[in-house]
Amino acid sequence: MSIVIGADAAGLRLKEVVKNFLEKENFHLVDVTAEGQDFVDVTLAVAAEVNKEEQNLGIVIDAYGAGPFMVATKIKGMVAAEVSDERSAYMTRGHNNSRMITMGAQLVGDELAKNIAKGFVNGKYDGGRHQIRVDMLNKMG
């Protein structure tokens, strides 16, 4: 499993905080950030890399998280969540089988961002009754 991470200019500093944290937790990181990318381009780059392997997960950071979330939901088969707390990050894996989260650097601080990332990457899909909704989401697009 790889954790694919990317950020636009507004999310660069926080992306480095999250990236360094996850590397210290021994996760394999793929950083697709390129200088000058806006949130649309970076979200598309993260999604493309996430979709290479079923186990891959993605994190996109910009100023508020809303823009990358909107982009991610336009990608067929991508289930994404905009999160600003640890519990939502964890639960979106368990109940929605989300493969990507977005967060805003102007909304969450360093420690919260690390906890959000930790909750997301450590979350496991519960399946069962949740699969009905996931199937519905996957048919969209």
From Swiss-Prot:
Keyword Calcium found: no
| InterPro entries in the cross-refs | LacA, RpiB_LacA_LacB, RpiB_LacA_LacB_sf
Which Pfam families does this one have?
LacAB_rpiB
* Catalysed reactions, as listed in the record: aldehydo-D-galactose 6-phosphate = keto-D-tagatose 6-phosphate
UniProt GO MF annotations: galactose-6-phosphate isomerase activity; ribose-5-phosphate isomerase activity
SUPFAM superfamilies attached to this UniProt entry: Ribose/Galactose isomerase RpiB/AlsB (SSF89623)
Family, similarity comment? Belongs to the LacAB/RpiB family.
Q: Which HAMAP family match?
A: LacA
Please describe the quaternary structure of this protein. Answer: Heteromultimeric protein consisting of LacA and LacB.
Q: What is this protein called?
A: Galactose-6-phosphate isomerase subunit LacA
